[in-house]
Amino acid sequence: MKSLRFSSSLALALAAVASLVAGSARAQAAPDAPALYRQHCAACHGEQRTGGMGPALLPESLERLRRPEALKVITQGRAATQMAGFAPALKAEEIAALAQWIYTPVLPAPTWADADIRASRVETPGAKDLPAKPVWSADPMNLFVVVEGGDHHVSLLDGDRFERMHRFASRYALHGGPKFSPEGRFVYFGSRDGWITKYDLWNLTVVAEVRAGLNMRNVAVSGDGKWIMAANYFPHTLALFDADLKLVKTYAATTADGRASSRVSAVYDATPRQSFVVALKDIPELWEISYDPKAEPLYDGLVHDYKMGEGVPKPGQFGVKRSRLDEPLDDFYFDQAYTHAFGATRPKGEGQPNAQVVNLDVRRTIARLPIAGMPHLGSGITFDWQGRRVMASPNLKDGAIDVIELDSWKPVKTIRTPGPGFFMRSHEKSRFAWTDSMMSPTARDTLTIIDKTTLEPVASVREPGRTLAHIEFTKDGRYALASVWEMDGALIVYDATTFKEVKRLPMSKPVGKYNVFNKITRSEGTSH
């Protein structure tokens, strides 16, 4: 018995040693992802993965790129870019290690200070001397800027003939919608990894570029065209530029006492107020930053003792006016008077999404919107219905359009759709609103058309088995343009009255299209 116990113990010990040896061998054979990155990737994507010739490879920048897609890109490369596939050079396990490693945080965390922003700026020689008139013959007010996310290009479309006029390469992953100067000559693009590109539409050339941050949400252009503001996720900052993309100042996205900081959810221009309005992702505040040279001075908090210096104001222009909220806003849009901001909250953990109305004059939440699910208020529209002003918004969770009266903040109707959607669009001269169901696995191929006078669905158009989304109208509202949101996609032109297809242009995942006139006139049917 003693011998048997000894043999068993010896066997267990030998098995343990064998397991350790095997584990050690596996560890030694495991690919060294940091070394592989330095050898194959750093030259284009930067030593700290902050980007260079190629985009940033930070977790914040890759949050919308699924890991299987990242693996595919490393393996096969990207068409029409300098990203070559590494399948011939690396083993499958090495590629897998790289794909996993780029989603891990960089330590120590990279920084992006004012000096870095200024050093990043480049200007195209001679761009300022280009003629102040288009080099092409189309209507500059009915021009469409089409962002093709499939191969990171931008197409310019004649909105009368529906012909592509020009196509050029863009920065990686443009986001948040391009913004136009007030006369429609210049367009400003913001990329996920922080670059702002100023492009001269009339002369078909880049004017200047600057990197505002390492991970950026969107940009806004002031109504007078003099100022550009960028909202950053990383670092937690806002960056203010002049029209030539020269840095004016940065704002730390923190509470007034500096104890908490936040990602910046979005920044939008409020032209009638001569200000930028800013939502913070992690702090329950909505900021308003005036660019009016005659803006009234700002006082932080209550002034009750001038001897303590509490009555000393801050300059009104470019100062931060804070509206304190119960919960942070993920995104928002305005009523046509720009008195109210409608924002959606995406709480963490067990909390439920909700919507709130912020009065920008009294600087507080004045109503909660009775919307279930996950409202996508950043894509809402407003219009008149039976003598009342209403807003309508798609829902990211439920197949529904919620219609709310703006005077009472009470629900008017919930319009059922085939599935949850992301975009809703209309036009002042059109009777109809169009919405997609692109968040639905079964109805992503369907656009639902709603009669704004009856609030009833009246028709639908389909692209079977493919994603159909993001409507934009021509400046006169006669035609509606939709995206087949696929790599081998297309731009489809529909008659906005009969809903019949008029023309189809092949494009590479046209994620968004933007009409110059509708954007600069702040059409009630599109995002601002």
Q: Which ranges hold each PLM region?
A:
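Extracytoplasmic electron-transfer domains, predominantly the class I c-type cytochrome c fold
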Residues: A43, Q48-G52, L57-V106
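Repeated scaffold domains used in trafficking and secretory/extracellular systems
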Residues: P131-K133, L174-K179, N215-V221, A260-Y268, ...
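Loop/turn-rich, solvent-exposed surfaces of beta-rich toroidal or solenoidal domains
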Residues: P420-G489
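Residue-level detector of Asp-centered blade-edge/turn motifs that repeat once per structural unit
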Residues: A138-P140, P182-E183, G223-D224, T271-P272, ...
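The canonical Cys-X-X-Cys-His
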Residues: A33-E47, L98, V154
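Short loop/turn segments that connect beta-strands within beta-propeller blades
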Residues: G159-R161, D200-L204, D242-K246, Y291-P293, ...
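Asp-box/WD-like beta-propeller blade repeats and closely related beta-sheet repeat scaffolds
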Residues: A212-P284, L302-V320
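A short beta-strand motif characteristic of beta-propeller blades
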Residues: E163-A169, T205-V210, L247-G258, G316-R324, ...
